Amino acid sequence: MTYVMLVGSDVALLEGLSQSLAGLGHRPSVCASIRDARDACVARPPLVLVVDRALASSAGAELLQLPVAAGGARILYRMASTPPLPLLPALQRVVLADLTLPLERHRLAALCQSVGERAKATGKAPRDTPEGLRAI
């Protein structure tokens, strides 16, 4: 199971994607803003971080500060009716894919699956340890 965080302002789209990813065995989480995502990422870094390109463009370097689990990936998305906004070169280098949703929702699911399998194969998959059993 891959922990996927979806960040964007289109709640209906993200909830639909969340349900689709959950149906495939992933553990999705939805955040409406970069600030909410930062708080959630600090508590538990996602293996896959999926962010609206408009938010990424306006957040700039702040998006680079969101922690991702070891072996994880950042993915950007935009709506088909929205032109792609410019990104910082540093952000362009760390993005695994730039998707047009909902058209490429199957590609998103495949990328989440691939990142999860790669993390398991390399030993970088996050382990779910119950709170009481964690070392200090």
Regions found by a protein language model. Give the residues of each.
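Conserved Asp/Asn-Gly motif in the active-site loop of CheY-like receiver
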Residues: C31-R35
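C-terminal output helix
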Residues: L99, L103-C112
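Conserved acidic carboxylate
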Residues: V7-G8
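CheY-like receiver
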Residues: A119-I136
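Conserved phosphotransfer microenvironments
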Residues: R38, L47-I75, M79-L87
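As written
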Residues: A90-L99
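Alpha2 helix of the CheY-like receiver
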Residues: R38-D39, A109
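Two-component/phosphorelay signaling modules centered on CheY-like receiver
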Residues: V11-V30
